[in-house]
From Swiss-Prot:
Widely expressed. Strongly expressed in heart, brain, testis, lung, spleen, liver, kidney and myeloid cells. This is Protein yippee-like 3. Keywords: Apoptosis, Metal-binding, Nucleus, Ubl conjugation, Zinc. GO terms for molecular function: metal ion binding. Probably ubiquitinated leading to its degradation by the proteasome. Residues 19-116 form the Yippee domain. Belongs to the yippee family. The gene is Ypel3. It is found in: Nucleus, Nucleolus.
Amino acid sequence: MVRISKPKTFQAYLDDCHRRYSCAHCRAHLANHDDLISKSFQGSQGRAYLFNSVVNVGCGPAEERVLLTGLHAVADIHCENCKTTLGWKYEQAFESSQKYKEGKYIIELNHMIKDNGWD
């Protein structure tokens, strides 16, 4: 018997005319390049990017962690399609110089790929 697999469907698709980042494990769209804030972040497993907004991402419960820039309340984020942990969301920053991170998302480079329009 031959099994025919259904094509993957994601909760949200980003516009094809924009450069975007996708999950390295399942190719679910994650973020537009226009939402990239900084490439100068460090994740738990290496370099990471800070984004203003993301799609197809679920959020775990917030917890306090001491990161390189001080104490923050963060929630792990995962790909809604393949459930891979991608990084975290900054829920609260306790130092005034770090407040700009609140509501923003860290995605580690080893969990995303550049997709569409990167010539």
